[in-house]
């Protein structure tokens, strides 16, 4: 039945979160409040694994599936839209993009994000990267709100020149 529900959602235009439905079902079934969070996690994990199997049957690469399904806030429709956009654009095969983001990840992987104080940016390349990242964030948010998954997937590539310039000039 789970795969049937997921297939209905994948084939529809419905972009809904299943979490409120799961919570309402637990209330109707009189699940004790102290057990609801644990049960909710188990049900969501069960649905996520079934969705993963559907994507694997469609030969979506494991790393693409793992990336998407690591965000438990995604609806089935969002996951489907992003899978299609990622497969159409294959940003994971863009060597320059992967290298730039790997360098950035290695720089910040042990840092806890607390925000950016733009007054501390001294080098032009830092300022350019911050401005580009701010615009990219806005573009990504607007594309996400519009349901334009291709545009969401295209945003990271727009930062590559600023990332590369940052590493050339600052690092």
Where are these regions (language model features)?
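Amphipathic alpha-helical "coupling" segments that flank catalytic cores
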Residues: 1-171
């Amino acid at each position: 039945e789970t795969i049937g529900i997921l297939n209905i959602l994948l084939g529809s235009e419905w972009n809904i979160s299943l979490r409120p439905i799961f919570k309402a079902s637990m209330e109707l079934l009189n699940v004790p409040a102290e057990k609801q969070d644990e049960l909710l996690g188990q049900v969501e994990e069960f649905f996520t694994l079934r969705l993963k199997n559907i994507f694997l049957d469609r030969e979506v690469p494991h790393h693409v599936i793992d990336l998407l399904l690591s965000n438990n806030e995604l609806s089935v429709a969002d996951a489907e839209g992003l899978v299609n956009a990622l497969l159409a654009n294959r940003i994971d095969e863009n060597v320059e993009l992967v290298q730039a983001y790997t360098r950035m990840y290695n720089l910040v992987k042990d840092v806890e994000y607390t925000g950016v104080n733009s007054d501390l940016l001294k080098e032009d390349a830092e300022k350019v990267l911050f401005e580009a990242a701010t615009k990219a964030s806005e573009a990504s948010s607007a594309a996400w709100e519009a349901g334009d998954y291709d545009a969401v997937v295209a945003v990271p590539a727009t930062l590559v020149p600023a990332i590369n310039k940052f590493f050339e000039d600052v690092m």
